[in-house]
């Protein structure tokens, strides 16, 4: 059985050669379920990018999908190179987070074209698309709100579905639980945080899949 893990940095993992590879929450879950972890999550991914990860997982014939949404306050960089293309299934497109550290040309784009409200709306649309795509595929799946915590539309029913879980590893990154945080591991969680995340997620999987 192959489990697809889709998302942003919260779902990314260290390399197989890293001493802590087996201690990442995705690999703990895969071992518990006697499955192969197919980790598509990448740092900085937008929800659009996460949608393309789901598509890749379907092409790779994954059996189960665990999808972790990201903040809608990100955007796809379409003017650098030609990486956001149909030809490569949009796999190599660049994504960027809106923050003070953004590059000057990104701020030029943000000032002219970026709308936080539109990106939130796009996030809802993409979530609905992921939900319906996986529903139609017949695959087992769960979608976790994770870092998509802003401005849930009152008339949006997709976030009320049983397959959408109102939690994610992002919630462990808190001032109240500094022992779960790490600046050195790519998924932002300490080894203790990874263990806590895996236990909580296995509980959701057992209860909902």
Language-model features: where?
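Alpha-helical cap/lid subdomain in secreted, periplasmic
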Residues: 55-209
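Serine-esterase "nucleophile elbow" of acetyl-processing enzymes
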Residues: 1-48, 55, 190
